[in-house]
Design a protein with these regions (language model features):
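Conserved acidic
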Residues: 1-675
Length: 675
């Protein structure tokens, strides 16, 4: 769509080269969606000004929230948390309005520009983390390897590479070592033996000199730099995570706190919680501590270390060689990334901590080491994102760094499940602040389990804490005791349902007919119609939706089984009504039923339904959060058909044994959950 002299837009067709050339000549931005955008130097959007203002105010509120939280002021922390969330909602609402045809802000191209930019930024961060920390590259075919090497040869500043290699006497990899690196990254995607493509790559590498092979190996890759230059990398990390000595405090230590950036400030805050406590660096009373100078001195020493290794940093880590083929990255197999969302990338540094410290104990020394690698990732990611923004066309130096991803949290223990965006963890650090007591973090609808019976939810919460706290304290997790806890609840649910009770059934909601946008015959609303037409004449009709319901899984799942089930009903008129109701909707079986909670609680489960309730399926649904927790212990037995439940493996006597709570006092301690 191109605007004419009157501002009206018409469809035009151009060759892509002409389209790009036009953008370059007119100094326009080209978004990832290939939309052309006027830069703010030519015309700034009013909405952009509004969003920037909200961003500044939100950052201020987040800072106030952290200050209040650090001082133990829960009221103000909650107040500022709500304020910053409101600013976030206001900005996000603009994006939603761009999608709505009924809004005066409707703009069909804006939302795709926003989401694609976010996804690319996230892909850049995840791809970089894989290569930087794990030496893992997305070499999913032979051509990708050759094209990547060609790109490095084209974009690299070879004066900087030679200076770094010669200045630090870096190992110059052999052809065999480069090929080993390639095959390690390629092996998840294609066979690396007896393949002509491998020979093509090998011939390419054989034509390189030692400096070029070093660039192939070390470009954006700290893992392989360490593999072949271990002493150098250890010395580098020493300078970033070793606390300063009192006798080395520099005279201008306070001035250095003003000179360094936020990442270095966060690093030194992690190093000195014993001196800083919960206070901000500008707190006057901190100056009364004679050791306060260590903080600024460490800021200086970190800067000095970065300056010492600037030749390596400039040659290999802040270059034009940013992560490649981001559009294909979603199919990559990760070694470092453990979770990711639209605007976040969670990665592990446990192998680096083990390499540096010789152990993976959870203590303050190892937290400093972990934060050090988070610091390096944050610094290099900042460069990669700024380069990406520059590729879009942004020239304003300040605006180049507006798209950013900061090192926000450190989780000493992170438990990942097979469900996307479902994990639980403990949080030790937030933006440089070390918590005296670790916070508990839980994400994912299934793990939050808000629709579980309160008693089950309470034990589930305690189980998650037990797993996390045991690992944090270096204790073994008793899988046997965990299984007994799960089996105990499964037996209770089984006995309750077969006894006609409802306390462990999952709740649901049936809404008004107009609230369902898709085919209404396939929505929850038909449960209201079924109750009114079939069961209402006997058990009483229910009020118009919305209303609360209880979910029942019904075993008859074919026409034949349904006919056999209906033949058992004593009330033949009701059976006929069900037959007609199913026929009127072209259904052969019921499947899941949402029965009105008010009726079921007062009259009980209808006798026609009770014999065919799929008790195992209901147990599986109710206990699914427990099975997600079991997966973190590498115990997998859950499938769609409920072919194996924990109660099948643990007898009733075992489940209800006298020492069931031996799993840990945590499972009964009120400290582990917040009512």
């Amino acid at each position: 769509l191109e605007r004419d002299e009157h501002g009206d837009r018409d469809k035009r067709a151009y060759p892509l080269t002409v389209y790009v050339d036009d953008a370059v000549k007119r100094k326009l931005f080209i978004a990832p969606t290939l939309s052309q955008i006027l830069p703010p130097e030519q015309k700034e959007s009013l909405l952009a000004k509004y969003i920037k203002g909200n961003l500044a105010e939100r950052n201020a509120e987040k800072h106030k929230q952290m200050v209040a939280k650090n001082k133990g002021d829960g009221f103000r922390a909650t107040l500022h948390k709500n304020n910053q969330n409101n600013k976030k909602i206001l900005n996000n609402a603009i994006s939603g309005n761009h999608r709505s045809e009924h809004s005066h802000l409707f703009d069909q191209s804006t939302h795709p520009i926003l989401t694609s930019s976010c996804r690319i930024a996230n892909g850049v961060a995840n791809s970089h983390n894989e290569r930087f920390l794990g030496g893992n590259r997305h070499y999913f075919n032979v051509n990708v390897v050759i094209h990547h090497f060609t790109s490095i040869l084209e974009l690299t500043d070879w004066h900087l590479v030679r200076a770094a290699v010669d200045g630090f006497n870096l190992h110059q990899p052999s052809v065999e070592e480069v090929m080993a690196m390639v095959m390690e990254s390629a092996s998840p995607y294609w066979k690396v033996r007896n393949r002509p493509g491998i020979r093509n790559i090998e011939r390419f590498v054989e034509g390189m000199d030692g400096y070029e092979r070093a660039a192939m190996m070390y470009m954006g890759d700290l893992y392989h730099l360490r593999l072949y230059n271990e002493e150098l990398v250890r010395h580098w990390v020493d300078g970033l995570c070793t606390r300063a000595k009192p006798e080395n405090i520099i005279p201008d230590h306070e001035a250095w706190l003003e000179k360094v950036d936020g990442d270095i400030i966060n690093q030194v805050k992690v190093m000195y919680p014993d001196i800083l406590g919960r206070e901000e660096l500008d707190e006057p009373k901190l100056r009364e501590n004679p050791l306060f100078g260590l903080v600024g001195t460490s800021a200086y020493e970190i800067t000095r270390t970065l300056h010492e290794y600037r030749a390596i940093i400039n040659a290999f880590y802040v270059t034009k060689n940013i992560p490649f083929l981001i559009s294909d990255f979603p199919t990559s197999i990760r070694k470092v990334g453990v979770a990711s969302d639209t605007d976040s990338a969670i990665f592990t540094v446990q192998d680096w901590v083990k390499w540096y410290s010789g152990n993976m104990r959870i203590n303050h020394d190892n937290i400093i080491v972990a934060e050090t690698f988070g610091f390096l990732v944050s610094q290099t990611t900042t460069h990669n994102l700024a380069t990406m923004v520059g590729n879009i066309g942004v020239t304003n130096k300040k605006e180049k760094f507006r798209l950013s991803m900061k090192n926000e949290y450190l989780f000493p223990v992170f438990a990942l499940t097979s469900r996307a965006k479902h994990y639980f963890a403990n949080m030790a650090v937030q933006e440089g602040v070390v918590f005296k007591e670790y916070d508990f973090e839980k994400k994912g609808v299934e793990l939050i389990a808000s629709n579980l019976a309160p008693a089950i939810r309470k034990d589930h919460e305690a189980l998650l804490h037990y797993i996390i706290d045991s690992v944090t304290e270096g204790k073994e997790v008793s899988l046997h005791q965990v299984l007994r806890t799960v089996a105990k609840w499964e037996y209770r649910i089984h006995d309750s349902i077969t006894g006609g009770k409802t306390e462990y059934l999952k709740s649901a909601r049936v809404n008004e007919e107009d609230s369902y946008s898709q085919d209404r015959e396939n929505t929850k609303y038909i449960n209201y119609q079924m109750w009114q037409d079939v069961f209402g004449p006997v058990y009483g009709t229910v009020e118009q939706p919305p209303y609360s319901a209880l979910s029942f899984s019904i075993m008859p799942d074919t026409k034949k089984k349904t006919v056999e089930w209906l033949a058992t009903w004593e009330d033949r008129e009701m059976a006929d009504r069900m037959t007609k109701w199913l026929a009127s909707r072209n259904k052969t079986y019921v499947g899941e039923m949402l029965l009105p909670e008010s009726v079921i609680l007062s009259l009980g489960i209808p006798k026609e339904i009770l014999p065919v309730i799929d008790v195992r399926k209901i147990i599986a649904k109710a206990m699914s959060p427990f099975y997600l927790a079991l997966e973190t212990l590498e115990f997998y037995c859950f499938d769609n058909k409920q072919s194996k439940l924990v109660m099948d493996m643990v007898t009733r006597e075992e489940a209800f044994g006298d020492d069931i709570d031996a799993i840990d006092p945590a499972l009964e301690a009120d400290d582990y959950y917040d009512d």
